[in-house]
Regions:
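Catalytic and substrate-binding clefts that recognize carbohydrates or anionic sugar/phosphate headgroups
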Residues: 1-189, 199-201, 205-206, 212-217
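Aromatic-lined carbohydrate-recognition surfaces of secreted/lumenal glycan-active proteins
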Residues: 193-199, 225-229
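Aromatic- and carboxylate-enriched substrate-binding clefts and catalytic-loop regions
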Residues: 47, 221-235
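Loop/turn elements at helix/coil->beta-strand transitions in domains of secreted/extracellular proteins
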Residues: 188-193, 220-223
Length: 235
């Protein structure tokens, strides 16, 4: 793990308010000399190299999307996200890559990410995009951008930022290091990590128990069962 400072970071950032913030520097293999940084009238911008076939995941709780590759995302707080734009109850400016690294941006600003952008001046073209899809596999295959592409991060109003580059053999290892960096945390019960299911708010106790029985008999890994709350009808 390595901390890199670009420009003049802001004073009020998440790490300042994290009593258990644990940064331990270790050598990394990431090509930091290929990171590009600049400030503009709008804020600051960083660009990171991206390898062919590299896949990106993360940005905290994301309800509408899992794989962020070739997507534009904004880590914006929103209690009712309706599309896969990065809006979330709990967005985090941290992503992980299948190339063996993750990057945390120590900023409280909304960060605008572009995961797979052609270098400036290069056309946005996909490998084999002239080929006609004639099967399900080719139609839904992960497309790769032709030429050199980057990961871009724009931070409006900021004149700089600290980033933490974390490396590991697996995504789990990278996320574990991020968890320790951000202060660790208590272990949650196993059922708390399972899917939840909400029954109709008018269900009786017998109907709820029957639903629970059905889920178990069909090996559905639901660990939390509840009722639809009615959504503020009598708040």
């Amino acid at each position: 793990m390595k901390k890199l400072t670009f420009g003049t970071p802001e004073a009020l950032v998440p790490s300042v308010f994290c009593d258990g913030f644990q940064y331990t520097e270790r050598p990394i293999h990431y090509a930091v000399d290929r990171i590009r940084f600049k400030t503009t009238a709008r804020g600051c911008r960083l660009e990171f190299p991206m390898q062919p076939g590299e896949q990106i995941f993360g940005l905290g709780l994301q309800l509408k999307i899992f794989n962020l590759t070739h997507r534009q995302m904004v880590t914006r707080v929103n209690s009712d996200p309706i599309s896969a734009t990065g809006d979330s109850h709990a967005p985090v400016p941290f992503f992980v890559s299948t190339a063996g690294y993750g990057i945390y941006f120590d900023t409280a600003r909304y960060v605008e990410f572009d995961f797979g952008r052609p270098r400036a001046g290069r056309p946005s073209q996909y490998e084999g995009e002239r080929e006609i899809a004639v099967s399900t596999e080719t139609l839904y295959a992960q497309r790769e951008l032709a030429g050199e592409v980057t990961i871009a991060a724009n931070i409006p109003a900021a004149r700089g930022v600290d980033i933490y580059i974390i490396e590991g053999e697996t995504i789990t290892d990278i996320v574990s290091q991020y968890n320790m960096l951000s202060g660790g945390g208590c272990s949650v019960p196993e059922w708390g990590l399972t899917p939840f299911y909400r029954c109709c708010s008018r269900y009786s106790q017998e109907q709820i128990l029957e639903t629970a029985k059905y889920l178990r008999e069909h090996d559905m890994p639901v660990g939390i069962l509840g009722l639809e709350p009615g959504w503020q009808t009598r708040a």
